[in-house]
Amino acid sequence: MAEPLLRKTFSRLRGREKLPRKKSDAKDRGRPAQRSEPKPPEPEPRVLEGSQAGAEVPLSPETPRSPARGAYLQSLEPSSRRWVLGGAKPPEEISLGPRTPSSGEPAGEIWYNPIPEEDPRPPAPEPVGSQLASSEPEGPILQGAAPTSPPTKTSRTKSPGPARRLSMKMKKLPELRRRLSLRSTRTSRERERTAPAGSVISRYHLDSSVATPGQASVAGGTRSPRGGYLSDGDSPERPGGPPSPTAFRPYEVGPSARAPPAALWGRLSLHLYGLGGLRPTPGATPRDLCCLLQVDGVARARTGPLRSGPDFLRLDHTFHLELEAARLLRALVLAWDPGVRRHRPCAQGTVLLPTIFRGCQAQQLAVRLEPQGLLYAKLTLSEQQEAPATVEPRVFGLPLQLLVEREQSPGQVPLIIRKCVGQIECRGLRVVGLYRLCGSAAVKKELRDAFEQDSAAVCLSEDVYPDINVITGILKDYLRELPTPLITQPLYQVVLEAMAQGHPSRASLGPEGTRGLLSCLPDVERATLTLLLDHLRLVSSFHTHNRMTPQNLAVCFGPVLLPARQTPSRTRLRGSGPGVSSAVDFKRHIEVLHYLLQSWPDTRRPSETPDVAPYLRPKRQPPLHLPLDGPEVVTRPRGRGGPESPPSNRYAGDWSVCGGDLLPRGRDFLSGPDYDHVTGSDSEEDEDESGEPRGTTDFEDEFDAPFNPHLNLKDFDALILDLERELSKQINVCL
């Protein structure tokens, strides 16, 4: 399998000397093989200095062929036999593994096998007379310009240059690299024991096996016990233990240190080596510890439960954290508290990320923990990114005057406010908890980006944004992020003075008087606030449906429309802290907005709906007149033949007996909608406070919306109760 590669290798090593050797071998094959007696080795003649470069040295008598050649050739395959006959190598020269040079050939000749196909076999036994002293020089020795070896017997010992070049080319073959790396350790040791010290194979294995430099261990400073040579494709051995504590730089952040203004983007690789200095209480049982990593206060990684040791806890954990505008890295050591059955922090340390990576990408730190302990860790910053360029705001956070001039919106009101208010008034006035419930954060982020790109192209239809709470949340976010609040300091003072005069009354102030409070505002702010107050007044008029009274709306929009601190200093409590003053501010905000909503004219109140379906109006039943002149006869209901229907079956029976006065459209009414489409309503509004049934006009006042084709089951329940009450009464029957 490896014959073509072996031939190519030998052809490169021999070069142009192959042809003369073949000719000499052809002459030798014509002579009869003679058995020669073993002779003692003769000293190799040397060439003296000053002799001519082309002078030849007398050759020793030719060595006859061995009789084992024929048996050896018969045992080979045809292809191997042709290759051996072509090279004219005697069987004594063909052996696997290293061998010592025999008589009649140079001392440095080797059998070079660049691809170890099989495990090496022990070398074949050689005649005793062919052994040479190990003190003889290996390879040709040059003195001046004259070679010491005879020219007729060409030496096959080559310098490591061609072998190294071949080795570098063979690195591209992954299969050979794998096989060589698997066999290098075992075969190198065997060659080191069997081959002489001066053998070329013992020094080079494809000329790329270099002895590994001694790596001092961390603990004792001794060499790694695993020795030998590394073949192509091998990597250096991994250190056996963690670095010594002296390799870590002490790091400590003061208690008054603040987060740096700069931020960090990229990927942080954090390797934890151990915890030291955690001195447990004498006599205490070992605790279960874990390490929690936080980036800017957000938990990002956590180790499993670890059993604490006497003084040092060895760790081997690696975490890869994606950083986005990161500033602080905090490591918390948590200990299990069996009393409360949860982990409690027992030590913590902080690292300022932007400062430790100045001029380098990796740091080995011994982070000081408070109140005690050290955390040994290696921090590596890879794939560092530049801070994203700040995008100029186009809608959110932009002054109202600038936004209106850019959009050229009619009425001097931004488009985002007009679109949101229009959608809320169209389909959200009857939603319970309007402006109190929050929508999806992801959908709000998507809608915010759409407004930032192009406010005119945003569509807020129900098909695109079915959740009305997303639109209300976007509107409140926009008002909250305005550089200047809509209710400015001058308007705030005006409203406080109006509140000091007495309870707000629309009759006392009048429509123009209430709107006149906004005259101190600029044109854009006055138009925007007027639109918002009209909208909030309309929302509060539907408080029976959405539960949003003026007080609830003031709680939601007070901190949004007013700045954080506008309470005059004289109203603040003396000696009060910032928490008390902020609570007073929040209360004042609610009172100011509540006053404005109560005194604001309700010009957009929905008109009443006079045309209500006649079959939905409750009609007064005429009194029942019965002749009572005869004697009184008490009757009791007779039992029915079959089992009575359960009381839960409310809707069984024939409704036609009710007559046309009660339900003039009873048949069409009952055959129309299905009960599955019936919606519920509040039962507390069925009767007045006095307990008397409502009149027709009172019932019609409730319908301030278009006719709803859905039915009300509670009206049927009330009707059934009235019928059961009438049927259960005892009546006098005249006989």
UniProtKB/Swiss-Prot annotation:
Q: Which UniProt keywords apply?
A: GTPase activation, Lipoprotein, Palmitate, Phosphoprotein
Its job: GTPase activator for the Rho-type GTPases. As a GCM1 downstream effector, it is involved in placental development and positively regulates trophoblast cells migration. It regulates cytoskeletal remodeling by controlling the activity of Rho GTPases including RHOA, CDC42 and RAC1.
Residue ranges of region Disordered? 1-253, 601-655, 669-706
Question: What GO biological process, any one, is recorded here?
Answer: regulation of Ras protein signal transduction
Q: What is this protein identified as?
A: Rho GTPase-activating protein SYDE1
Where is there biased composition of kind Low complexity?
151-160
- Supply the Pfam families for this chain: C2_SYDE (PF25336), RhoGAP (PF00620)
Which organism's genome codes for this protein?
Rattus norvegicus
Please provide, alphabetically and separated by semicolons, the GO molecular function terms listed in this UniProt record.
GTPase activator activity; GTPase regulator activity; protein-containing complex binding
Which positions carry Phosphoserine? 224, 231, 235, 244, 681, 683
Summarize the PTM comment. Answer: Palmitoylated. Probably palmitoylated by ZDHHC3 and ZDHHC7.
Q: Which Gene3D superfamilies match?
A: Rho GTPase activation protein
Q: Does the keyword Phosphoprotein apply?
A: yes
Domain of life of the organism encoding this protein: Eukaryota
Phosphoprotein as a keyword of this entry, yes or no, is yes
Q: Tell me the ranges covered by the C2 domain, including all copies.
A: 249-366
- Site-annotated residues for Arginine finger: 436
Database matches in SUPFAM superfamilies: GTPase activation domain, GAP (SSF48350)
Listed under GO cellular component are: cerebellar mossy fiber; cytosol; presynapse; synaptic membrane
